[in-house]
């Protein structure tokens, strides 16, 4: 059974332009679902939409939206109002490196909107639809920083922790329904952003050896959908979390994560 047959005609990817979001779009289209692609780079999304339409004979919509704005969801919800919605993935994120007091409040507010407020509005909106029709699926994307916290990148980790715990709770609430909900927690992933900032030498080589591709992440997410509520992506990441929780204190884990960003 394809995703379209199981969940409905349309899926929405929030943060669809590249990386994991793009891989979600490709997976939906491959399984016959029409795709609503939401992001800031409208032309790039249209190019992706045409590529998917020509390859998989699906339909698409592009919604240009800035997730950091308080009214970001207005045009998103309007664009999907009359569609047979069956899937949602929230991939969008925003972070800023530095100590809390050294980051301008405007940046903090933007991160709260992207990582918490807009996420929650979208999750609430589409869950109401899926629950009412007793059909649909949600996969939200968290990060290892949401498990450990992320010193010098604190708001990002806190936002990902909110996505992680909120989605886990809703996933449990929907277990005995026909709505499948899952959160997938990512480690290092080979997105265009990572590749453009990859350090040279042994450090960069080490990252390349452990990182997953967006396609690997999305494949695992769908493999576990309807079977597990909360997934840590990749065997290395699963083993790492297990080791730290079994053999180290929470303080050790926090300081370890902080060592990656400490100024």
UniProtKB/Swiss-Prot annotation:
Binding-site list for NADP(+): 17-21, 40-41, 66-67, 240
The UniProt record lists the keyword NADP: yes
Activity profile over pH: Optimum pH is 6 and 10 for the reduction and oxidation reactions, respectively.
Site features described as Lowers pKa of active site Tyr, chain residue numbers: 160
Dependence of activity on temperature: Optimum temperature is 37 degrees Celsius for the reduction reaction. The enzyme appears mostly inactivated at 60 degrees Celsius.
Keywords noted in UniProt: Bile acid catabolism, Lipid degradation, Lipid metabolism, NADP, Nucleotide-binding, Oxidoreductase, Steroid metabolism
GO molecular function annotations of the record: 7-beta-hydroxysteroid dehydrogenase (NADP+) activity; nucleotide binding
Reactions catalysed, as given in the entry: a 7beta-hydroxysteroid + NADP(+) = a 7-oxosteroid + NADPH + H(+); 7-oxolithocholate + NADPH + H(+) = ursodeoxycholate + NADP(+)
Primary enzyme class: oxidoreductase
Keyword Cell wall biogenesis/degradation applies: no
Active site: 156
Gene Ontology BP annotations: bile acid catabolic process; lipid catabolic process
Top-level lineage group: Bacteria
Entry function: 7beta-hydroxysteroid dehydrogenase that catalyzes the reduction of the 7-oxo group of 7-oxo-lithocholate (7-oxo-LCA), to yield ursodeoxycholate (UDCA). As R.gnavus is a common core bacterium of the human gut microbiota, this enzyme contributes to the formation of UDCA in the human colon. UDCA is regarded as a chemopreventive beneficial secondary bile acid due to its low hydrophobicity; it protects hepatocytes and bile duct epithelial cells against necrosis and apoptosis induced by more hydrophobic secondary bile acids like deoxycholate (DCA).
Entry similarity comment: Belongs to the short-chain dehydrogenases/reductases (SDR) family.
Protein name as it appears in the record: 7beta-hydroxysteroid dehydrogenase
Organism: Mediterraneibacter gnavus (Ruminococcus gnavus)
């Amino acid at each position: 059974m394809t995703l379209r047959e199981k969940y409905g005609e349309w899926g929405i990817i929030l943060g669809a332009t590249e990386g994991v979001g793009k891989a979600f779009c490709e997976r939906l289209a491959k399984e016959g679902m029409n795709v609503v692609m939401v992001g800031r780079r409208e032309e790039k999304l249209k190019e992706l939409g045409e590529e998917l339409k020509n390859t998989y004979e699906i339909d698409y919509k592009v919604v240009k939206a800035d997730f950091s704005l308080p009214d970001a969801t207005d045009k998103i919800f309007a664009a999907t109002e009359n569609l047979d919605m069956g899937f949602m993935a929230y991939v969008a994120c925003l972070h800023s490196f530095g100590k809390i007091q050294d980051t301008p409040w405007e940046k903090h507010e933007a991160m709260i909107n992207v990582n918490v407020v807009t996420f929650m509005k979208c999750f609430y909106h589409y869950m109401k639809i899926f629950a009412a029709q007793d059909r649909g699926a949600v996969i939200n994307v968290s990060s290892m920083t949401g498990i450990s916290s992320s010193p010098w990148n604190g708001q990002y980790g806190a936002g990902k922790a909110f996505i992680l715990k909120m989605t886990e709770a809703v996933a449990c609430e929907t277990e005995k329904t026909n709505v499948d909900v899952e959160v997938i927690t990512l480690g290092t992933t080979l997105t265009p952003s990572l590749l453009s900032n990859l350090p040279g030498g042994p450090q960069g080589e080490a990252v390349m050896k452990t990182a997953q591709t967006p396609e690997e992440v999305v494949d695992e997410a769908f493999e576990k959908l309807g079977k597990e509520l909360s997934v840590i992506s990749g065997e290395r990441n699963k083993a790492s979390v297990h080791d730290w929780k079994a053999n180290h204190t929470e303080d050790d884990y926090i300081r370890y994560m902080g060592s990656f960003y400490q100024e």
